[in-house]
């Protein structure tokens, strides 16, 4: 998967199209990512010992990785991701600027 935790992405499809946010978590087996402030759902929570009031909680749900695009670190525009070997290590690069994408977990 070309998106990692901590990456800044832009939603390119779906109800939250155009929104930008940071990737909170990834689910590689399902090809899904959770983006901060995107795809907010309401979850009905029963009262429990830890949360005696219960109620309706708002939380972020996962969206498919094909609906987000990585933001170029140089220009802050959506870009595709490429891979290149530098000093024997495989690194991600932004296709638009050629800039190396650093992981900021």
UniProtKB/Swiss-Prot annotation:
Keyword hit for RNA-binding: yes
Gene Ontology terms: biological process: translation
Domain of life, source organism: Bacteria
MF (Gene Ontology): rRNA binding; structural constituent of ribosome
Record's keyword terms, sorted: Ribonucleoprotein, Ribosomal protein, RNA-binding, rRNA-binding
Role this protein plays: One of two assembly initiator proteins, it binds directly to the 5'-end of the 23S rRNA, where it nucleates assembly of the 50S subunit. One of the proteins that surrounds the polypeptide exit tunnel on the outside of the subunit.
HAMAP family xref list: Ribosomal_uL24_B
Protein name: Large ribosomal subunit protein uL24
Organism of origin: Staphylococcus saprophyticus subsp. saprophyticus (strain ATCC 15305 / DSM 20229 / NCIMB 8711 / NCTC 7292 / S-41)
Lineage of the species this protein comes from: Bacteria, Bacillati, Bacillota, Bacilli, Bacillales
